[in-house]
Amino acid sequence: KSPSLLISVERCGASEDGIYRNMRDVDISNYTAKIDTLFDLFPTSIGIGDGGNEIGLGNVAKWVTKSQELVQFPARTKVTKLILSSVSNWGAYGLVAALSLKAGINLLPNTTEEAQLIKHMVNSGAVDGISGEAAYRVDGFELGEYLWALDKLNEITDIRLH
């Protein structure tokens, strides 16, 4: 079967000049799979981003370029629905929370699992997206701060389901 929907979370998209850049406007084209092409061709899609360089931020590119906090060269790829969030993962968790309410079961990861995953990724070489440091942080947020949002979404989702 063919997919009915494409979803992109924190996935770098090419800017108008065809270059893939990270949040610091560094060219990462050689390290980036060109999946934004799929989104250009597919009729139904969701993009979740936080900095302007992600697939879907083409929907708001003219506003991204006016911001001092976001990238200078926004992604050009547009999506059917765009979710903006301070941290892309938080936007994805929000989507999963909404799907949980539709499904009648909490589909969100718990904070213990998420903390273990982040620690494993950092221990395997991942770095924080803001500082570039190998630290237990996500987009500049300390692990506890980052997990607080997931914990609250789990709490709210559980309350709404029961």
Predicted regions, residues:
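Acidic-enriched, low-complexity/disordered segments with a strong bias for Aspartate over Glutamate
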Residues: 17, 25-27, 36, 40, ...
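Hydrophobic/aromatic beta-strand patches that form the interior of the parallel beta-sheet core
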Residues: 5, 44-48
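Fold-independent oxyanion-binding glycine-rich loops
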Residues: 9-12, 48-51, 98
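An acidic, phosphate/nucleotide-engaging active-site surface
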Residues: 1-39
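A structural motif corresponding to the C-terminal end of an alpha-helix
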Residues: 34-45, 99-103
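C-terminal functional extensions of proteins
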Residues: 55-162
